[in-house]
Regions:
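N-terminal pre-domain/capping segments
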Residues: 1-115
Length: 115
């Protein structure tokens, strides 16, 4: 059995918009804490202006996977983008397109990490 936790637990505090720790720092902290597997929380790093929202997101994902490998943390789970059902009642077609695009991107990222 592996013991795992999510990078999302290290990135922000109480789901605030501000990220207090980078994914790299979260991975290192999780390894130092003694976990032997990891959940990459792509949704935490996918808001506007964060790495999973950038044009070079694939390069960022590759670096995170390499960092996990360096710390002997197999990626056993990933969290994709999700949205509030209540908020979705107000979505425009562009909002839906953006949300579906983020979900597809996160699924691809999970595949890149062999989840």
């Amino acid at each position: 059995m592996r013991i795992s936790t999510s990078t999302g637990t290290c990135g922000s505090v109480f789901w605030t918009q501000k990220m207090y720790y980078s994914c790299e720092q979260a991975i290192e902290s999780i390894a130092k804490a003694g976990f032997d597997a990891i959940d990459l929380c792509f949704v935490a790093y996918g808001r506007k202006g964060l790495p999973m929202d950038a044009p070079d997101w694939r390069d960022w994902v590759k670096r995170q996977k390499e960092n996990c490998d360096k710390h002997n943390l197999p990626v056993t789970q990933a969290h994709a983008h999700y949205y509030s059902v209540a908020e979705s009642m107000k979505f425009t077609a562009l909002d839906w397109e953006d949300n579906i695009g983020r979900i597809k991107r996160d699924i691809e990222a999970a595949g890149m990490c062999q989840v």
